[in-house]
């Protein structure tokens, strides 16, 4: 990510085709280590491509990736109502109970005297 950030900073600074030395100097300015392999890979992947098209393509791909966190989504869908945080707080408790129940169903407990 730091190599990509350095590349984008170079572009924002007006450098239309940053070199590996440009990226290394940007990374060195903030005390970050420069990985030559990652820099070369990035430069080879973006060579001759428009950065705005690459970003748009990346956004489309990220939009199609399913994301976890159903509790966060449910809380966000609440629209800021006062009950949303309470509902989100109750969800993990229900999951913990089901895990305990599943252990009991298997007849396995860490604290059995058997």
Swiss-Prot record:
Give the range the annotation lists for the signal sequence.
none
GO term, biological process aspect, one: cytoplasmic translational elongation
Residue stretches of biased makeup (Gly residues): 74-83
Keyword set for this entry? Phosphoprotein, Ribonucleoprotein, Ribosomal protein
Mind telling me which GO cellular component terms the entry cites? cytosolic large ribosomal subunit
Q: How is it modified after translation?
A: Phosphorylated.
GO molecular function per UniProt: structural constituent of ribosome
One matching Pfam family is Ribosomal_60s
Which spans does this entry mark as compositional bias, Acidic residues?
Answer: 98-114
Q: Which InterPro entries match?
A: P1/P2_N_sf, Ribosomal_P1/P2, Ribosomal_P2
Q: Where is this region: Disordered?
A: 74-114
- Report whether Metal-binding shows up as a keyword of the record: no
Q: What is the purpose of this protein? A: Plays an important role in the elongation step of protein synthesis.
Describe the subunit structure: P1 and P2 exist as dimers at the large ribosomal subunit.
Please report which protein family the annotation says this sequence is part of: Belongs to the eukaryotic ribosomal protein P1/P2 family.
Identify this protein by name. Answer: Large ribosomal subunit protein P2
């Amino acid at each position: 990510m730091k190599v990509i950030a350095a590349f984008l900073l170079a572009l924002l600074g007006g450098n239309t085709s940053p070199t590996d030395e440009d990226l290394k100097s940007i990374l060195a300015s903030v005390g970050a280590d420069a990985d030559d392999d990652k820099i070369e890979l990035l430069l080879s992947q973006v060579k001759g491509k428009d950065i705005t098209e690459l970003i748009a393509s990346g956004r489309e791909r990220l939009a199609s990736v399913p994301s976890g966190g159903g509790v966060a989504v449910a809380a966000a869908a609440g629209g800021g109502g006062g009950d949303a945080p309470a509902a989100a707080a109750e969800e993990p408790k229900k999951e913990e109970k089901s895990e305990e129940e599943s252990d009991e169903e298997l007849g396995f407990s860490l604290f059995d005297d058997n």
